Amino acid sequence: MIRFPNAKINLWLRIVARRPDGYHNIETVFYPIQLQDALEIVPTSQQETELSLSGIVIDGDPQNNLVMKAWRRLSCRFSLPPISIYLHKAIPFGAGLGGGSSDAAFLLAMVRDYFRLPLSDDELDKEAASLGADCPFFLHNKPLLAKGIGDEFEPIELSLKSYRIVLVKPSVSVPTSVAYSLVTPVLPEEPVRDTVSRPVEEWRGRLINDFEESVFARFPEIGEIKDRLYEQGAVYASMSGSGSSVFALFDKEVDLADCYPGCFVWTGICEV
């Protein structure tokens, strides 16, 4: 069985409150894009489940990969036999794109289907939430408004069909803990539902990522990418999550693959 975990972008991100437990309450809109990893599970004669990695190099012990944590959740709960897992990484990490969370969520869904587990969609959501606040989003893969610590989801009317999207990630990565330590919570002046209901051409200056000011000050090359995307005709551009990737929406076809040497560049079409 093979499936293709996709990335997401944050169309906006507001830090609205600091919580007593040290976390932050946020408001953000998750939007799925078609930048994808490849994930395969197959039977094995081995005594233990193994994860094989290819593509973008991921540092650290594969046993600590979120995919393996997802596997252990279900294998322990249902006493499952070992499998072999193959993960080809194409989604950059440390980019605010949710690649690791997507891999884990897809693995949960694949294991449920492969072994025909008696697991409802709601139960699968709970298993995903135990792995990461944004993991359940990838089980639904449609635009959602996220609140709380990013784990409370509400449907939102939004369509970006036919827009072109360009994603640029510089070589620098922004640690999430560092990004949060630099921001001050601020309540948005306009409800997000009102803002995203406006034409995309009106989003600039209205949809805000609260991480940008402090992250751009510390990593000016990220801010320069956003400015350049606007100069190249973007209708809307923003950093995704806590960075370091920047995405831009265009109302026409563009080819910017050679415009950002040393950066990861991906171009696609918005499908929802």
Question: Where do the PLM segments sit?
Answer:
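Contiguous, small/hydrophobic- and glycine-enriched helical/loop subdomains that border
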Residues: 104, 108-145
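Solvent-exposed alpha-helices and their adjacent loops that cap or buttress functional pockets
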Residues: 32, 129-130, 136-139, 156-161, ...
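Glycine/serine-rich anion-binding loops at beta->alpha junctions
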Residues: 86-115, 133, 235-247
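Short, basic/glycine-rich phosphate-binding loops at helix/coil junctions
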Residues: 46-60, 107, 129, 199-208
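ATP-binding N-lobe of GHMP and related small-molecule kinases
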Residues: 1-95, 113, 117-122, 157-160, ...
